[in-house]
Amino acid sequence: MKIEEKIKQKYLYSKNFNFIKIIYFFIQFFKSKFKYKKSYSFGSQDLITEKFFKNKKKGIYLDVGCFHPVIGNNTYKLYKKGWEGINIDIDFHSIDLFNFFRKNDENIQIGVSDKSGENDMFFFHNRSAINTLNPIRGKNAKEVKKIKIDTLNNVIKKTKFANSKIDFLTIDVEGYEMNVLKGFDIKKYSPDLIVIEFMDLENKTDDIYKIEFYKQNLNKILNSELYNYMIHNNYSLVNWTFLDLVWVSNKFKKINS
């Protein structure tokens, strides 16, 4: 038996606590806390994207409803890998953070919809990830303001990615996802992977904070406008994590089969 194994047998595998075992536990604790940060997303969506794009060193992402550049972010892992893209949010504080932490990206403050102009914005508080353009989702908002909106197509045209293929699209806009998609040329930009938050707007809860993933209904997803839209545009639903649905392009699946 090697010396290392003898030490483990004597001290680490002992039923009694000892100094070496305590030091070992502390090392493991701090390694798990600081060294092995695996996911930044709220529901580990970035682990799916990391595996999906494991062989792609450079790529382009589009994050609508980005909110924070690191915490709960689906694209930060890709950014660290060398990717770049467009981050969009209605909150200028969020865009300030992105401009500081994600200098290689194009970070834009605007509301995204299926039309250009102005729209009511439903505020729960200024720095809230649940502020929304959706009147049903925002029925108990504390304040309503008019904000500038534009289509995703128009927003992209004003960036350096206007004629680029989008590899990864993620949308989290609190029940306004279909409006965003309708203003996006999905055939032109043809993302290989799309992550979209799914909101059951028929959920009658008066407390927006009580909408949880375990209250989602698979039948409602399969009969939703979003599902039919994505199937019609040649995407397959391949995963469901937290509140997000994960879609893969059938073209990508065929090429990589």
What are these regions (language model features)?
Residues 1-257:
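Phosphate/nucleotide-binding beta-alpha loop and adjacent structural elements of enzyme active sites
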